[in-house]
Regions:
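N-terminal segment of the mature soluble domain
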Residues: 21-40
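Feature activates predominantly on carbohydrate-active enzymes
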Residues: 10-22, 26, 65-160
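Short, well-ordered secondary-structure micro-motifs within conserved domains or adaptor modules
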Residues: 36-65
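Cell-envelope and extracellular/periplasmic
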Residues: 1-12
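Flexible, charged surface loops at secondary-structure boundaries
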Residues: 1-2, 42-46, 75-77, 130-131
């Protein structure tokens, strides 16, 4: 059962590229038999998991300022669908929200804080604009570089 999924990016953007890599990594962790999921740049694609901005799919963007306001849109089946956002950061948030809706948990920073179930992904529908434009935490003390990077990764998975 190899290449069960495909990931298609609607545009070439550093953050969307990272979102595609993260989706590929976690799909493989959840379903090792799904094989090596190919990632490609295919604007206008209509199959596979499609990552892009809301406008790439003709979806309305209710954000006042798309650069600062995060809108996440998910409309998937078991074989793929749309993971979109108001900006590239929101596309990454859409990937993490999709994974959480499928049972993944990011409990605390670092690999040990992740719970990734072994299961087939299910279709999801979700659309939300963030309640607050600015979200996050602060760190106190003197974290190491490794701790700081793990914290940044964790906060992104919490859509902050």
């Amino acid at each position: 059962m190899s290449n069960m999924f495909t990931i298609k990016k609607m545009r070439d953007d550093q953050t969307i590229n990272f979102a595609a890599d993260e989706l590929k990594k976690y799909l493989w962790t959840m379903m090792p038999k799904s094989g090596n999921t190919p990632i490609s740049l295919e604007p206008g694609a209509t199959d596979g998991f499609r990552l892009g901005l809301l406008e790439d799919f003709g979806l309305e963007n209710e954000a006042t300022d798309a650069t600062w306001d995060d809108v996440v849109h998910i409309d998937t089946t078991t074989q793929g669908g749309i993971l979109a956002g108001s900006n590239p950061r929101s596309v990454l948030f859409a990937v993490y929200r999709f994974l959480k809706l499928n049972g993944c948990r990011f409990l605390f920073p670092g690999f040990d804080g992740e719970y990734i179930p072994r299961k087939v992904v299910t279709g999801q529908k979700y659309h939300k604009m963030a309640d607050l434009r600015l979200r996050g935490h602060t760190t106190e003390g003197d974290p190491s570089l490794e701790q700081a990077l793990q914290y940044i990764d964790y906060q992104t998975k919490q859509e902050m």
